[in-house]
Amino acid sequence: MSTAKSDAAHEATDRQIAALERRIVRLYSTAERGLRERVIAYFKQFEKQDEQKRKQLEAGEITEQEFIQWRLAQIGRGKKFEVLRNKVAEDLTEVTNEAIEQVAAEMPEIYAINYNQEAEAINTDEGSAIPLIMAAAVVLLWHQKSDTMTRPKLNRQKDIAWNSRNFSASVTSNILMNKPLLGKNSICIASITMAVEKSQHSARVNARTFLTNAETRGRQAVYTAAEKLGMHREKTWHTVHDNRVRHQHALMDGITVPATEKFSVDGHDMVGPGDTSAPPYLWYNCRCRMTSKRKKKVVNVSEEQEVV
């Protein structure tokens, strides 16, 4: 188990991620209120028919399966449902796009916080004078060099299709559970809530994913700068010690490599946590971090070697 000293920049990154997640939740809560009105209006069209069918069910005139099949055919399908489903999906994608823009806006600040902490640590260790950086400078750098960090992007058509499937599946699922049509714990409310929660969860995970990328990129930039100035460092991967850490990252805990080289994670080269050049399962929603220290030097003493 790695035992790195306190890491103020990583803690600051975590705080900013938490604050960003709260803003994302508010975005989706606002969107859900508008969507809920539209969904309720759609389901109200079927209120009288649904009551009649339920009375038939209670009277034993139709079976529960026949009642469910009627609901599926009348409520969960057809042109009107497609219009509703598409509107829900498109509106959720708009919210996702806004969330992604907020994530991208936070990344330069995270990059700068982590760059500056590591620069100060190296300057203390090495007696160097690596200059610090401001978030505004990172923004300019990012415009000039697109690979400074991984910019989050939204595939609109893919996201709309995903939201559409989620909403359809939630309506079908709640119909199959034979919930009431309207009301607090109804098909209507549960369906929109489930669709919104899935989209919101994805947006929150994106926040963690890309701010971790910014953290790592800021730190790596300092390590590279130090190496160019003749200061040889090594970096260590640190994982979060809980039951949520993925197996591949648990194996990386405490692994140390030269600061300008890459870690080998499950057979893939990675600059550090959140490196999106690796397959997504190795960086999506990553909570790991990396730190650096002065590289040990080996000097000859007579015929023996001494490590200092």
Predicted regions span which residues?
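N-terminal leader/targeting and assembly helices and adjacent pre-domain segments
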Residues: M1-K198, S202, K293-V308
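Acidic, glycine-rich two-metal-ion catalytic cores of nucleic acid-processing enzymes
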Residues: K198-V307
